[in-house]
Amino acid sequence: KYSRGRTSQNNKNKIGVIAMNKSMKKSPITTHILDTSTGKPAANVAVKLFVQSNNEWHLIAQGKTDTDGRITDWLDTDVEFATYKMEFDLDSYYQNKEMPAFYPEAQITFRLQDKKHHHIPLLLSPFGYSTYRGS
């Protein structure tokens, strides 16, 4: 049976959660790695993020993917319009899985030209990888 008080209480809790999530700032650049050879996220992959300035690469963040294959929290500031590069340590990832890997690392270079969130997915296997502009 419909209970007005209970429904109001439930809605209030949901609104509080939404407001809390909106106030949390997401990194302007994120990544997600899926291992297509297993059909699962690639956890514990070391990733470095660089920005290019004066024709030199400068390390601005690094981390490891979580159990869902994601890094979402490595930058807490806005980023400048520039060229960026992610380096993914595939050699260590596949060594830990006791699998051979043809590519010891993957590099993805991309250019930011707006203030939108930029999600850079990587689909990988021991003998290939691909990427695309995520959402």
Residue ranges of predicted features:
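Short, Lys/Arg-enriched N-terminal segments with co-localized hydrophobic residues
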Residues: 1-20
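Feature of secretome-associated and extracellular-like proteins
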Residues: 16, 21-22, 83-135
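Beta-strand-rich domain onsets/edges
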Residues: 16-43, 51, 57, 129
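Short hydrophobic alpha-helix segments
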Residues: 37, 45, 61-63, 75
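Beta-strand signatures of extracellular beta-sandwich domains
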Residues: 46-50, 85
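Short beta-strand and strand-turn-strand segments in soluble, beta-rich domains
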Residues: 54-59, 101-102
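Glycine-centered loop-to-beta-strand initiation motif
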Residues: 65-75, 86
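Short, surface-exposed loop/turn segments at beta-strand-coil junctions that are enriched for proline
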Residues: 77-80
